[in-house]
A protein has these predicted regions:
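A charge-rich, low-complexity, intrinsically flexible signal that marks solvent-exposed coils, linkers
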Residues: 1-58
Length: 58
């Protein structure tokens, strides 16, 4: 069984799907915590993230 790699999104990119996205550190993929989760609508841009973090769908 193989683990599926989640797609990473960065601030300013267009969101492909309305969903809740969590922030993860770029260097080791550590989850920043639920207080930094953001709901982003399809077609909108991802909001600013923590320094050196990206978004992944939850």
């Amino acid at each position: 069984m193989f683990a599926r790699t989640k797609t990473k999104y960065w601030s300013g990119q267009i969101c492909p799907k309305t969903a809740t996205y969590g922030q993860h550190r770029d260097t080791d993929n550590t989850y920043a915590g639920s207080q930094y989760d953001r709901r982003v609508d399809k077609g909108e841009r991802f909001p600013p993230s923590l320094n050196n973090h990206h978004f992944e769908e939850k």
